[in-house]
């Protein structure tokens, strides 16, 4: 199992709990994530877990909670080019949610419960290369809130605890 994190900040607490886990800092955004995954040379036996913080639309997902993304869509593409990536089965016992991958703050959810900046790249690469993709996100904020209101530390700590549970179960 390989754990991908967009930033060192998101990975730090997990590294402290699981120092022997394979952690890769993929970079922020779809391009950086796709390039990082391509450099790993994944095969069908690999499981890549994309981990990080995310924003929630509305009140359906609580700040501080940890979820598994089971459906991901890049909503910034014109509608006729959009593809929804669906997970056939959840990988974890976490609540499954639908997510949008965005590069700019989207105040419209398009039916998603959360947003992030890397997930669609993970699932596109999984389709192309045949590895198992899992996306686990901790909710740090409500979409549209200013950064000073985000609960990054709380979210990163909650994420690390859930990932440790996943690591211990493998």
Locations of regions flagged by a protein language model:
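Glycine-rich phosphate- or other oxyanion-binding loops that anchor nucleotides, phosphorylated ligands
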Residues: 2, 7-170
């Amino acid at each position: 199992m390989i754990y991908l994190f967009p930033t060192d900040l998101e990975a730090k607490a997990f590294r402290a709990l699981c120092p022997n886990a394979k952690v890769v800092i993929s970079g922020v955004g779809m391009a950086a994530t796709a390039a990082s995954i391509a450099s790993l040379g994944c095969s069908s036996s690999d499981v890549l877990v994309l981990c990080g913080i995310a924003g929630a639309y509305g009140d359906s997902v609580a700040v501080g909670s940890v979820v598994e993304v089971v459906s991901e869509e890049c909503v910034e593409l014109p509608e006729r080019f959009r593809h929804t990536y669906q997970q056939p089965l959840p990988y974890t016992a976490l609540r499954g949610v639908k997510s949008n991958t965005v590069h700019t703050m989207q105040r419209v959810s398009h039916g998603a419960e959360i947003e992030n900046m890397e997930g669609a790249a993970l699932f596109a690469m999984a389709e192309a290369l045949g590895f198992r993709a899992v996306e686990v996100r901790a909710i740090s904020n409500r979409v549209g809130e200013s950064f000073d209101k985000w609960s990054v530390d709380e979210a990163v700590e909650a994420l690390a605890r859930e990932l440790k549970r996943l690591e211990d179960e493998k």
